[in-house]
């Protein structure tokens, strides 16, 4: 699998671009809020290390972790089908599907971690019922 570096040597950072580094944290909050909103208005990327309002960061963490939880919970019904698959080929297909869903969840957990939350915190929230996931997985999966 290919990865992309955060800073490409082929692209020179532009002034005000997210690649030019994080926002100065010593600026007044109103000025930082203005910069943040101007970036959004200009449809520029907001990187995890950039300044953002705490409510915005929490919302991103909630959305990304909910998506990650849904990927992980979504593989559970398919995992129970593996032993019931009629052939080795179908078992391999189900295994690949489960592995794919797990990989999606892990990528999303890693993305949420860049926003400043630990994976253990997200999993504890899921296990305690404080975090949500897609409810489609609560219905019986007929085989």
What are these regions (language model features)?
Residues 2-143:
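Non-heme di-metal
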């Amino acid at each position: 699998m290919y990865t992309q570096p955060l800073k490409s040597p082929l692209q020179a950072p532009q002034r005000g671009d997210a690649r030019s580094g994080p926002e100065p944290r010593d600026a007044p909050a109103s000025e930082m809020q203005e910069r943040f909103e101007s970036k959004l208005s200009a449809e520029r990327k907001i990187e995890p290390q950039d300044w953002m309002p705490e409510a915005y960061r929490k919302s991103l963490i909630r959305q990304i972790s909910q998506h990650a939880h849904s990927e992980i919970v979504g593989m559970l019904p398919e995992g129970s089908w593996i032993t019931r698959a009629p052939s080795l080929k179908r078992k391999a297909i189900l295994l690949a599907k489960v592995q794919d869903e797990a990989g999606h969840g892990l990528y999303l957990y890693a993305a949420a971690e860049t926003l400043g939350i630990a994976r253990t915190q997200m999993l504890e929230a899921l296990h305690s019922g404080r975090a949500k996931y897609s409810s489609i997985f609560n219905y019986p999966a007929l085989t």
